[in-house]
Amino acid sequence: MLNKIATILTKKLILNKTINEEMFDIYVYGFELLISFLFSTTLVMICGVILNRLLQTIAFLCVFILLRSFTGGYHAKTYFFCSFVTLLTYGMVLLVSSFIQVSLMHYLLILIIGIILLIVFAPIKHPNKKTIPRQRLRHKIISIILFCFFVAVGIWLTRISMVVSSAIFFTLIADLVLLFIKNRKEIKNEDS
């Protein structure tokens, strides 16, 4: 269904002479990504509203989307499974952040571990996202800066909203775990 909608949108652009026919596959793929992203984000937002956890949800989405856009990480084989993993990750972050309060020491620990993991693993290579070495270095630097920024925001929020601060903390952990899972899969594939 996703492919069908993306194909219809792309054909409409071709008919309106907005894009060339040679760009058909690229635009179909782009629309598939956009629709999948909007679906997952909307689903998470709806859950946040229903569960009355809007601030935690916004914190999750900001950290999860911004950081992953520069670090890469686990990619599901289907758009449905991608939405499922995103929703599952969100649910786990929401659940854990509702029960566990984080301290400055937790943040300092995740800051050190996170920077090391980002230096070693980020950004993850993806076959559909070709990058040159300079872009990879740029993405690595941006991901480290974003990570540090979110840690700083999380620390600051411990004084205002511990639940939102915890949501940021556990979203950072989730991002690192998904980055690590993807990297382990790449290493296993290279060994095979």
Per-range role (PLM):
Residues 64-75, 121-130, 180-183:
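C-terminal ends of transmembrane helices
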Residues 113, 165-180:
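Small-residue-rich transmembrane alpha-helices that serve as helix-helix interface/gating elements
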Residues 93-106, 147-162:
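Hydrophobic alpha-helical transmembrane segments in multi-pass integral membrane proteins
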Residues 77-88, 106-112, 133-142:
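Cytoplasmic-side transmembrane-helix entry/capping segments in multi-pass membrane proteins
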